[in-house]
Swiss-Prot record:
CDD domains: Ribosomal_S15p_S13e (cd00353)
Its job: One of the primary rRNA binding proteins, it binds directly to 16S rRNA where it helps nucleate assembly of the platform of the 30S subunit by binding and bridging several RNA helices of the 16S rRNA.
Molecular function per GO: rRNA binding; structural constituent of ribosome
Name of the molecule in the record: Small ribosomal subunit protein uS15
Quaternary structure (record): Part of the 30S ribosomal subunit. Forms a bridge to the 50S subunit in the 70S ribosome, contacting the 23S rRNA.
This protein's record includes keyword rRNA-binding: yes
Pfam families per record: Ribosomal_S15
Any one GO biological process: translation
Assigned GO CC terms: cytosolic small ribosomal subunit
Protein family per UniProt: Belongs to the universal ribosomal protein uS15 family.
Amino acid sequence: MALTTEEKKVVLGEYGLHETDTGSPEAQVAMLTKRITDLTEHLKTHKHDHHSRRGLLLMVGRRRRLLKYVAKTDVARYRTLIERLGLRR
């Protein structure tokens, strides 16, 4: 379920502040969102994979905390990030 290096480069190139950015909240949230969508697709076919389900819940919680931090520090950045990722419909 891990992302390949190419997938990481695509996500970080699109959402990172610069090419090698991996630590900004936007990059971290984008990476978590990609992993969450991949894991959600996996769980649709493997309904009894409870170990992965727990990992999914941990990732969702981490993403929620990062989004809370971005919203607290810069609301405009938060709104653009939410809109770009397609969260909070």
